[in-house]
């Protein structure tokens, strides 16, 4: 059975209300996406400690699905009126029914990080059976290996981590770096995130990968220092957390920072140079990674 798919560009003030109104009046589904997804103006939305969390992109698109014979135009008009919108422009297309699970899975292929490290969704065969394969499915927590900052951190772990070292992954998201550290030889690894959903996702992913990782909310993190501290978050929390991350790093231990843009590396380097001897920044697709050794 074919469906009508309608796309409406709106601002963040009305996106959620419009999606709810469309559902209330008969849409089969309504999703909100970044209107600039896939372009240079794409807007990343993450919660930052101490900052109000943005929930909706400033410019969003509401994508609604209707049945083949639904009066989509009339429903859109009613929903628009309820949201105080006039002359609401939209585009529409007909899409055929299909196996949506299979379609979604087909969009995620194994990701090669290095000669020996792969990120592989659970529904794929491991591309190289003798390689280190992280089984990780796209989900609700950030971190699938596709983002440059995640790859930068994974490459550091792949080449620099020493067997038996203890690792703290602060802002762990899906737990990808925590799990990778253990698979690459860490003696222990702990993931921390401000989002309970990320903590749950980390535990689930660790179980899927048969590794003994621990995950905590910040208040639950036990006292202690680590040989390696990794923080793949954003520039603002990295500014705020510098002293704490330094305190969690053993003397002679190492820190790995990412989630910052190339142009932010110099400023962040100035902050962390209080505690660490920093290596030259590594960059990929406009994102940067800092690393260094604690004095």
UniProtKB/Swiss-Prot annotation:
S-adenosyl-L-methionine binds at residues 150, 171, 193, 232. Its EC number is 2.1.1.-. It is found in: Cytoplasm. Keywords: Cytoplasm, Methyltransferase, S-adenosyl-L-methionine, Transferase. InterPro entries: Ribosomal_L11_MeTrfase_PrmA, Ribosomal_PrmA_MeTrfase, SAM-dependent_MTases_sf. It holds the Pfam family PrmA. It catalyses: L-lysyl-[protein] + 3 S-adenosyl-L-methionine = N(6),N(6),N(6)-trimethyl-L-lysyl-[protein] + 3 S-adenosyl-L-homocysteine + 3 H(+). It is an enzyme of class 2 (transferase). NCBIfam families: prmA. Belongs to the methyltransferase superfamily. PrmA family. This is Ribosomal protein L11 methyltransferase. It comes from Neisseria meningitidis serogroup C / serotype 2a (strain ATCC 700532 / DSM 15464 / FAM18).
């Amino acid at each position: 059975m074919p469906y009508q798919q309608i796309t409406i560009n709106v601002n963040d003030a009305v996106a959620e209300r419009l999606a709810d109104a469309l559902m209330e009046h008969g849409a089969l589904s309504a999703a909100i996406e970044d209107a600039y997804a896939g372009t240079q103006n794409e807007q990343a939305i993450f919660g930052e400690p101490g900052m109000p969390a943005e929930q909706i992109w400033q410019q969003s698109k509401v994508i609604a699905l209707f049945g083949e014979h639904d009066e989509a135009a009339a429903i859109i008009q009613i929903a628009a009126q309820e949201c105080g919108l006039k002359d609401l422009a939209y585009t529409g297309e007909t899409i055929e029914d299909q196996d949506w699970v299979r379609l979604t899975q087909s969009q995620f292929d194994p990701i090669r990080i290095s000669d020996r490290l792969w990120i592989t969704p659970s529904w794929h065969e491991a591309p190289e059976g003798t390689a280190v394969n992280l089984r990780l499915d796209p989900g609700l927590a950030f971190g699938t290996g596709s983002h440059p900052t995640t790859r930068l951190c994974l490459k550091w772990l792949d080449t620099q981590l020493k067997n038996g070292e203890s690792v703290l992954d602060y802002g762990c998201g899906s737990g990808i770096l925590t799990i990778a550290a253990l698979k690459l030889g860490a003696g222990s690894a702990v993931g921390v995130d401000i989002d309970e959903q990320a903590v749950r996702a980390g535990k689930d992913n660790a179980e899927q990968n048969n590794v003994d990782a621990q995950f905590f909310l910040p208040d639950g993190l036990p006292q202690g220092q680590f040989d390696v501290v990794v923080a793949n978050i954003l520039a603002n929390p990295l500014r705020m957390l510098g002293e704490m991350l330094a305190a969690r790093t053993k003397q002679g231990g190492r820190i790995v920072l990412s989630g910052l843009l190339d142009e932010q590396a110099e400023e962040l380097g100035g902050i962390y140079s209080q505690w660490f001897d920093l290596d030259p920044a590594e960059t990929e697709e406009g994102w940067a990674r800092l690393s260094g050794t604690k004095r």
